[in-house]
UniProtKB/Swiss-Prot annotation:
SUPFAM superfamilies xref list: Ribulose-phoshate binding barrel (SSF51366)
Cellular component terms per the entry's GO annotation: cytoplasm
EC number: 5.3.1.16
GO molecular function terms noted in the UniProt entry: 1-(5-phosphoribosyl)-5-[(5-phosphoribosylamino)methylideneamino]imidazole-4-carboxamide isomerase activity
Protein name as annotated: 1-(5-phosphoribosyl)-5-[(5-phosphoribosylamino)methylideneamino] imidazole-4-carboxamide isomerase
Associated pathway: Amino-acid biosynthesis; L-histidine biosynthesis; L-histidine from 5-phospho-alpha-D-ribose 1-diphosphate: step 4/9
GO BP terms in the entry: L-histidine biosynthetic process; L-tryptophan biosynthetic process
InterPro entries per UniProt: Aldolase_TIM, His_biosynth, HisA_bact_arch, Isoase_HisA-like, Isoase_HisA-like_bact, RibuloseP-bd_barrel
Active site: 9, 131
Family recorded in the similarity comment: Belongs to the HisA/HisF family.
Length: 239
């Protein structure tokens, strides 16, 4: 069964969502992310994706207190991303309750450091973030398109021990227009043992069903839930 991973994106300690990574499109859904996380847990959710959008913009962890509150008041398994650029950032994330961390920009900008993290913490705790725009990896909160092509990037890091990848098609993220199903099928055809976490574009329970039928191991979703396109009750079929 596909693993369900709701997302809580944080700006100024509040639960927000963006469209295509545009900070100008910010919409606040809840002033208290802890209450959101507790509601998820009460409905059978076991895993949570927390993104520090302030951290992504400022290149260091910012909303670690919110992470700590969610971790201390729920039993959710949390993966945390956004602005992780140093050993200190990772220590802050893990000390404040993250069980896993996601590195995207750092894997492009400083691959030696990212590989040290894989070696030090293990592939169970380090997730590769592959944020894609026109099949190139985007960095710095999706504001900059790098020269890294998606498939060589994935091949390189799977050879270096990465087992889990969050792949976000930026053109789909927050648009409620459906996920990049063909892209995910292509990735799994090339990397059949990869724990691929699809992210971006999920607009309905049918999208989750389609990803499940395509063999995608896990899915991250946010706006569809916050906008009422998907209900927590509907998700029970996958739990």
């Amino acid at each position: 069964m596909i693993e369900l991973i709701p997302a809580i994106d944080i700006i100024d300690g509040k639960c927000v969502r963006l469209s295509q990574g545009d900070y100008g499109s910010k919409k606040v859904y809840n002033e208290n992310p802890v209450e959101v996380a507790k509601e998820f847990e009460a409905n059978g959710i076991r895993r949570l994706h927390v993104v520090d959008l302030d951290g992504a913009a400022s290149h260091h962890v910012v909303n670690y207190r919110t992470l700590d509150l969610i971790a201390s008041r729920t039993s959710l398994i949390i993966d945390f991303g956004g602005g992780l650029k140093s050993d200190e950032d990772l220590i802050i994330a893990f000390e404040n309750g993250a069980q896993m961390v996601t590195g995207g920009s750092i894997a492009v900008r400083n691959p030696d450091l990212f590989c040290r993290w894989i070696d030090r913490y293990g592939s169970g705790k380090i997730i590769l973030g592959a944020d894609v725009k026109d099949r190139r990896i985007a960095v710095n909160g999706w504001k900059v398109e790098s020269t890294c092509e998606l498939f060589p990037f994935l091949k390189d890091y799977t050879q270096k021990g990465i087992e889990k990848v969050i792949c976000t098609d930026i053109s789909c993220d927050g648009m409620l227009a459906g996920p990049s199903l063909d892209l995910y099928k292509e990735i799994l055809a090339e990397h059949p043992t990869l724990y691929l976490i699809a992210s971006g574009g999920v607009s309905s329970i049918a999208d989750i069903e389609a990803l499940h039928e395509a063999g995608v191991p896990a899915v991250i979703f946010g706006k569809a839930l916050y906008e009422g396109r998907i209900t927590l009750k509907e998700l029970q079929a996958f739990l």
